[in-house]
Amino acid sequence: MSSTTPSNPSTPAPPNYAAFQTELYTSAILHGRKPTVTTDPNKLEAQARAALPLRSYNYVAGGAGERATMDANRQAFRRWALVPRMLRDTSAKKVGVELFGVKYDSPILMAPVGVQTIFHEDREVGLAKACADIGVPYIMSTAASSTIEEVGEASGSGHRWFQLYWPNTDAITRSLLSRAKTSGFSVLVVTLDTWSLAWR
């Protein structure tokens, strides 16, 4: 991670994720300042509901149909755990990954989310800029409310991937892929299991 925050060069960035956790902890305990976003994942949905217009919240939180897939995904995720190894030297921490020949400082990616104009006026452009600032690859949805070119420009030197809902028309597919390549998207993420719009 860089020693300054890219969007504000005068603001020092935490040197690593553990330091950021310590910063949040110290700020809350010593100064009574809570983080803007909750650190409890079970409270994220309630916080989003309080912050978003109802239409926006319902779109992202509702799932499809009876939410069976959404519920199953959450249950599956809960079965994963970090198992610490005791009495080991942990002074050299590495959480980075290499994907498609590129090394990233973090294993985190920004998943594709379409129609972001219903969440914030900055749309996908704003999120792409934020991802570039912190070095997280941004995956743009085919269903984005910003254009491929806008996101490409907003990303600057940041890594950007393009998610494709495969169109029925080959000419449209070629056009999307050509525009993405020209705009600096380096990885293609293909969604194959969305044959029709879900009941939302």
What does each model-found stretch correspond to?
Residues 53, 110, 131, 190:
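Conserved, mostly hydrophobic/aromatic
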Residues 3-101:
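An N-cap/entry alpha-helix motif that binds or orients negatively charged groups
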Residues 144-146, 164-168, 194:
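Short, acidic/turn-prone active-site loops that include or flank metal/cofactor-
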Residues 115, 129, 153-154, 168-200:
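Alpha/beta enzyme core
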Residues 65-68, 118-123:
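A structural motif shared across PLP-dependent enzymes of the aminotransferase-like
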Residues 112-118:
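Glycine-rich phosphate/pyrophosphate-binding beta-alpha loops
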Residues 121-160:
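A glycine-rich phosphate/pyrophosphate-binding beta-strand-loop-alpha-helix module
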Residues 108-111, 138-140, 160-164, 188:
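Hydrophobic faces of well-ordered beta-strands that scaffold small-molecule active sites
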